[in-house]
Amino acid sequence: MILVPLITVTVVAGTILVCYILYICRKKIRTVYNDNKIIMTKLKKIKSSNSSKSSKSTDNESDWEDHCSAMEQNNDVDNISRNEILDDDSFAGSLIWDNESNVIAPSTEHIYDSVAGSTRLINNDCNEQTIYQNTTVINETETIEVLNEDTKQNPSYSSNPFVNYNKTSICSKSNPFITELNNKFSENNPFRRAHSDDYLNKQEHDDIESSVVSLV
């Protein structure tokens, strides 16, 4: 009977002691709890960042694989087109020789028609001659005007001061080397000799005198 109250007192005393210890250590326990909480939040952030990086890396790997597959498909298409070009049934395999001089297509067009596209040869069966495009053909019937050797010189542009090209009009008094054709001699001409009044009215003497002076 004595043991029952002793056990009860011991339990109550122990509970009070534990509560007192917890009350004294409450600040330290709170700080530890806060520190642990901060650590847990940091760990969660690190974990989320690692998961996002891993997802991005997987996306990059998938993009790279898609790019490689697209490149392989393009290479396959190029190889198929090259094989079609090099096929014997293509245009290159159907070229033939024309009189062992020119390579032509089966459509009787010259090779320049299909390859170059600019320097084109046109076969004219009527004239039996080859005419190049963008050229001018000159007919033999066309005549070319030749400068006539007997063309009269323009008297307004006479190059010889000693020759009178303008014989219909009176000569200019500024040129002393050209003689006058009439009997009116210029007094300002020093190259003319003095004439008497007897010779002024004689046309024969005037003509002789004029010819002599022109020769001089």
Curated annotation (Swiss-Prot):
Q: Which residues cross the membrane?
A: 2-22
The primary site where this protein sits is: host cell
Question: In which residues does the motif NPF-motif occur?
Answer: 160-162, 175-177, 189-191
> Known Pfam families for this protein?
Orthopox_A36R
All ranges on the Extracellular side of the membrane: 1
Record note on modification = Phosphorylated on Tyr-112 and Tyr-132. Phosphorylations activate the host ARP2-ARP3 complex and lead to actin nucleation.
Q: Where would you find this protein in the cell?
A: Host cell membrane
Q: Which GO terms describe its cellular component?
A: host cell plasma membrane; membrane
Topology feature Cytoplasmic, residues: 23-216
What are the Phosphotyrosine sites (modified residues) in this protein?
112, 132
- InterPro entries xref list: Orthopox_A36R
Q: How does it sit in the membrane?
A: Single-pass membrane protein
Which UniProt keywords are present, listed alphabetically?
A: Host cell membrane, Host membrane, Host-virus interaction, Membrane, Phosphoprotein, Transmembrane, Transmembrane helix
Keyword Membrane carried by entry: yes
Give the protein family: Belongs to the orthopoxvirus OPG164 protein family.
Physiological role: Involved in the intracellular transport and egress of virions to the host cell surface with help of protein OPG056. Also participates in the formation of actin tails at the plasma membrane to allow efficient actin-based motility and thus cell to cell transmission of viral particles. Recruits host intersectin-1/ITSN1 and activates host CDC42 to drive ARP2/3-mediated actin polymerization.
Q: How does it assemble?
A: Interacts with host NCK. Interacts with protein OPG161 (via C-terminus). Interacts with protein OPG056. Interacts (via C-terminus) with host kinesin light chain/KLC1. Interacts with host intersectin-1/ITSN1 and EPS15.
Put simply, this protein is called Protein OPG164
Q: Which organism is it from?
A: Variola virus (isolate Human/India/Ind3/1967) (VARV)
Please state the gene responsible for encoding this protein. OPG164
